[in-house]
Amino acid sequence: MLNADLKQQLQQLLELMEGDVEFVASLGSDDKSNELKELLNEIAEMSAHITITEKSLKRTPSFSVNRPGEETGITFAGIPLGHEFNSLVLAILQVSGRAPKEKQSIIDQIKGLEGPFHFETFVSLTCQKCPDVVQALNLMSVINPNITHTMIDGAVFREESENIMAVPAVFLDGQEFGNGRMTVQDILTKLGSTQDASEFNDKDPYDVLIVGGGPASGSAAIYTARKGLRTGIVADRIGGQVNDTAGIENFITVKETTGSEFSSNLAEHIAQYDIDTMTGIRATNIEKTDSAIRVTLENDAVLESKTVIISTGASWRKLNIPGEDRLINKGVAFCPHCDGPLFENKDVAVIGGGNSGVEAAIDLAGIVKHVTLFEYASELKADSVLQERLRSLPNVDIKTSAKTTEVIGDDYVTGISYEDMTTGESQVVNLDGIFVQIGLVPNTSWLQNAVELNERGEVMINRDNATNVPGIFAAGDVTDQKNKQIIISMGAGANAALNAFDYIIRN
């Protein structure tokens, strides 16, 4: 089941185990159970620290990752391959006693939860966002005996996941808890536990404080650290929006990679330098005083710095039509790689005729029954090679000059209405899902009246990546820079860093 390269990598990782692990498997006579049994046997044969026993669990096929004689609360329902294979390997190592790579303050927060909390997360194995949530909840289960977590592959347990239209979908004690990517800190916050502000207030002022965690942020941080400046990063997550990107093929010298791999490599590169990286928390305000630039965090802590580089990136742009907000995660989705498998053999729409929209339609056409692509303009804007591929697919319709006007449905999406711009007629297409791919909106809501923004809400910068406020710079997709590309953002981050350094030595 595992190829030779994966086995070799796994063998090296299993050598890091610090104790014994027991797979407790619930297996039947079905094909999926046989596949799971084969996977578990392959893994167990690679380490003397791993044993397998069989026992009836809540779901079949499934298995728990326990210590001998001790339940950890970690269960995988289905076969954790694809993006979830890393979640399994990490669970094995942590259950064996390998210390988690998490700040002690976060570990203390997890230990302080009283519980009991029983989490279940529905995933798809092609989902880029799901492993973050699965790994966060598995970690919490390892640390706190009052927490349990089960990963559920929606493709295996279709009856349970029938009404799940966006993953990851997290349930706590049977009630919906959250959707989409969540960090450990996000989960702790939703449970009412917040990071102690004193942990941040006691920090010495920085030379450069970078707000955001994407490519521009990483580039800026490395450049300023190499200049010997005291550098800090405050971000929700390292990698930013890139984490949600499936394939990257235009980052020069790297022929092909994924968003998650890119983000992991970025985090490793940042860690090689003396950079104070604060993740799982967001900035809520910024102001320049006579003595410093002050950045307020969501826990009301305040950080001070001589200069600040804003690189908070952008988020998916919404249609802003009736029914959309109400039916997000109920058929309205933004990530075809994550949520596409949930619409197998169903009819869906893709909104947007740029590269992202056409790529999404091509990918979805291989999964769903039928795709209708809507584009507001009179022609598609995607690269010609993508358009040719799209038009060759038999289960795709293209509607140009189409203005979407309403998402239809009560509890779930049942259709979309649009206006034909050439005739003025309103029409309805019955379908089950809508994937919105109309670009990004800058994450600048926290910057109102702090720095100058343009009509699109982007931070306005000059050739030095400086804003209108001395000492405050900006880089990446959050700015009014025309082209939004990873490689351009990294160059912008470096430019902002070098000009922040120049500002410091001149002031």
Curated annotation (Swiss-Prot):
Binding-site residues for FAD, renumbered to this chain: 207-222, 467-477
Cofactors required: FAD
Cystine crosslinks: C335-C338
The keyword Oxidoreductase appears for this protein: yes
Cofactor annotation remark: Binds 1 FAD per subunit.
UniProt keyword list: Disulfide bond, FAD, Flavoprotein, NAD, NADP, Oxidoreductase, Redox-active center
Coiled-coil blocks: none
Other observations noted: The active site is a redox-active disulfide bond.
Quaternary structure and partners: Homodimer.
Function: Serves to protect the cell against DNA damage by alkyl hydroperoxides. It can use either NADH or NADPH as electron donor for direct reduction of redox dyes or of alkyl hydroperoxides when combined with the AhpC protein.
Name of the protein: Alkyl hydroperoxide reductase subunit F
